[in-house]
Amino acid sequence: MTSWADIVIQGLPEVDVHLLAVTGSTAVELHKQLPPHVRSIQTVPLFGAAEPTEFTRYDEPFATTVLRRARTTRGAVERHFVPLLTRLLEALERPEAAGRQEAELIRDLNRYFVRFDHRASFRSEAAWNAFRDTVLAQEAGSDVETTLGDLVQGLRWLYSFLLPITMPVPKTDVVHATLAGFAGLAGVISKLEHGTPFVVTDHGIYLRERYIAMSAAGDSFFLKRFLLRLVHLVSRVCYVTADQVSPVCNHNARWEQRMGVTPDRIRTIYNGIDTDVFVPPESEPAGRRPTVVTAARVFPLKDIETLIRACDVTRRRVPDVHFVVYGANWVDKPYTERCEALIDDLGVRGHFTFAGYHDNPSTLYHEGDVFALSSISEGFPFSVIEAMACGRPVVATDVGGVKEALVGGIGIVVPPRGHEPLGEGLADLLLDHDRRADLARRGRQRAVEQFGVGQMLDAHRTTYRHWAGLPADPLPPAMAPADDPAPAEAVSVAPPTLPDAAPRDGLGEGPSRRPRPVYPPVVSDRSARTEHALNRGRGPPPAGDAQGR
């Protein structure tokens, strides 16, 4: 996701950008050079801030902060916040039905937090009593055990995950969210407050990935259900409010339609790469062991354990095979330790290497004969099309848009978690030079013709110009209806009227310069503690792609 945001921002210098970066904690590292047309960047740490306003409103006059806290009296909380909190808890009982009223609830919460103190409101006795009484009443008569610890953690989650809506949302021409999740709520608020067009790009399906993460979490049933309902509600509100939802592959559209997006608002925009940078090597090194290369952050969604088991399968036919995984192996230390233990258990220590972060992704793929992807969830993985552009045959699991990239037999697609077919497919290619060469040639050709960065940037440029009311080429084609969609009625708001002085020949020139699209997020959090919480359902979705780039 970070690679995508960097490409789009760097590639559209005519668009002024204001960034809203939702991060896991305060321990963040800015690892991308921001161009001059990025006018501002606002970080919102969900965890770790003793006083969140130090980050969310760092430029606010101290007197304003003091006055907001002073007006957050017990009476104000009881009159204004408790009814909103109760409405939210009631909405969580049926997140699949979220629509206009729930979008307005998000806006009303934002209006409240702009005027009153978020921290004082959640820490109040009135809020705790309302939360406890409402939840226990909802659970009355059910078989679900709800402990005091569950209630405390549930309220803490609400405190943290609602931080992105605690500050004023500036008026822009377009709001662009990188997922239908908590970061996207800025788009919901801006549309209802200002009539701002709202665009969502779906790399993966946020709710689906939370289901996967929570299934392995050690939390109670109550907490798992509570968080999944919250994510479901937030995702659906984003979907039904968005003017355009652009998945990075058609595969995601099925989920989007089931989550309330009408087909006429779904316009797929594939990821794109610079095929002049990602190129085949000039020559192959002599004497290299048969090598399988992977670019992946080491955490559960990438299912590195299946890749390790596939290595054990492949070495039966290719005894000197070497698997090399490039990518951050510190983001989930317990998972990395499990992988290391599995390597030892299977006796593949001499065949499997975690090589860490690679500082030159365009040459990473040259270090293998074949590229492998073992993920259990993806959007449209950059790593697959980068490998294709570098002339590396691909063996990948059937997740996300992988089949759309490898259409026509350009690679080998195997079932997720299927270490036997994955290992056999890799062995087949390593032992068949002619087939590797054919797939390399056809993969490179498809990457150049279909997945160049120019096509992606043109589609996003058109999207921005269209929704900003500027002359534009036709939008990407809308999605054909699914066989069994269950769309909700979209939230309808009249488009904003642009000033007459607004430039008509570009988005960044002219006498009347206005703030431009908001892209949440572009800053990734490399904190191991936060990443571990993330994969247990306690944090935001992964901020980067395969390597966290």
Enumerate the predicted regions with their spans.
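Carbohydrate-associated surface elements
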Residues: 251, 272
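Conserved donor-binding/catalytic core segment of Leloir-type glycosyltransferases
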Residues: 282-313, 324
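Glycosyltransferase donor-sugar binding loop
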Residues: 322-337
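Nucleotide-activated donor-binding/catalytic signature segment of Leloir-type glycosyltransferases, i.e.
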Residues: 336-357
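Aromatic "clamp/platform" in nucleotide-sugar-dependent glycosyltransferases that forms part
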Residues: 376
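Short hydrophobic beta-strand element within catalytic cores of glycosyltransferases
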Residues: 393-396, 406
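Conserved acidic donor-binding segment of nucleotide-sugar-dependent glycosyltransferases
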Residues: 408-419, 428-434
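A short, well-ordered alpha-helix in the C-terminal region of glycosyltransferases
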Residues: 428, 435-466, 476
